[in-house]
Amino acid sequence: MIDCQYYQQNECRSCQWLEIPYDQQIAEKQHHLKQQLISLDCSDVHWLAPFKSNEQGFRNKAKMLVSGSVERPILGILKNPNDPQSAIDLCDCPLYPAHFSIIFSILKDFIGRAGLVPYNIAKQKGELKYILLTESIATGKLMLRFVLRTENKLPLIRRELPKLLEKLPHLEVISINLQPQHAAILEGEQEIFLTEQQFLPENFNGIPLFIRPQGFFQTNPKVAAGLYATAQQWVAEFPIYNLWDLFCGVGGFGLHCAKALQEKWGKPIKLTGIEISSSAILAASHSAKILGLEHVNFQSLNAASVMENKNENKPDLVIVNPPRRGIGKQLSEFLNQIQPHFILYSSCNAMTMGKDLQHLTCYKPLKIQLFDMFPQTSHYEVLVLLERKKIN
């Protein structure tokens, strides 16, 4: 069991499974996954052993609510979201790399120097709401974002920035996010960059990826790299030349698979990636260019838009990595109609995935593997490779 002072003192209970031995956590997650798929024919499925995480120090991102005073800021959480007096400082949270606590100490000093008064929820006054810190495991470089109520402190931040960069030379991307509302919203729409660089370079399995502000990126790099590598290995076994990556984000799945397929089969691979976030599409397109993948088209669209394009060349493989709600009945039925040879389904919610697989009546699961992306909690990721059923 992790030695966590915050849990033992009942200050933070985010890690609800902390007292459960790790191997038991894995067993319970595997049992839960199988229960969600109980109505499917899994008789011929190859169940791979769960991919385990490090138990602590595995997170590459810290989301710290800022409270307290400008002289003594507190970075962590509020036990009671409406009570600034319930603040808990989580700078030594064991889920973060140990060196994050040193960075937090430097940032507290910066908050004082720049006069960033922590936002007081009860009084609806103050400026600084959150500090968001992300680290690239490939380079050790950092992305730092200050979530502020207004632009009022921008001149002071710019004035103090050179001193901060002296103390933290690994800071690659620094930005201000403006969130003016008095609401439980993490970030606003407007991002003001204080550095020339706007993306944090990462690299998994030789695939360059770019983490961007306001964008989704897995918070457990070791397990994320394992997830992408497994997807790559599974699909490279088959002669696939045309693939779609729906809900593609920064292109992790599609780029891994396209590169492996091109190397394995020696032919150009056509990759179409669909993602609603335009900044994610920029990042994915940049990665494809670095990899020298020429027949790649990343588009900023809703995943449902693929159902409107009847003339698109039919894919051999469709990758889906939807949000927790799953892909739904309509998209499932569309996939049944266009009948790609394979579907690779990555899910963070086995319950909705189980329902989607019931709708995918033309497909049977070949391989299933659990990835423990979120140790000390009941959550996990799962990867399923589906093959089109042979018609007798």
From Swiss-Prot:
GO terms for molecular function: 4 iron, 4 sulfur cluster binding; iron ion binding; rRNA (uridine-C5-)-methyltransferase activity. S-adenosyl-L-methionine binds at residues 218, 247, 275, 321. Keywords: 4Fe-4S, Iron, Iron-sulfur, Metal-binding, Methyltransferase, rRNA processing, S-adenosyl-L-methionine, Transferase. It is an enzyme of class 2 (transferase). It catalyses: uridine(747) in 23S rRNA + S-adenosyl-L-methionine = 5-methyluridine(747) in 23S rRNA + S-adenosyl-L-homocysteine + H(+). The active site is at 348 (nucleophile). Its EC number is 2.1.1.189. [4Fe-4S] cluster binds at residues 4, 12, 15, 93. One of its GO terms (biological process) is rRNA base methylation. Belongs to the class I-like SAM-binding methyltransferase superfamily. RNA M5U methyltransferase family. RlmC subfamily. Catalyzes the formation of 5-methyl-uridine at position 747 (m5U747) in 23S rRNA. PANTHER family: RNA M5U METHYLTRANSFERASE (PTHR11061), TRNA (URACIL(54)-C(5))-METHYLTRANSFERASE (PTHR11061:SF30). This is 23S rRNA (uracil(747)-C(5))-methyltransferase RlmC. It comes from Haemophilus influenzae (strain PittEE).
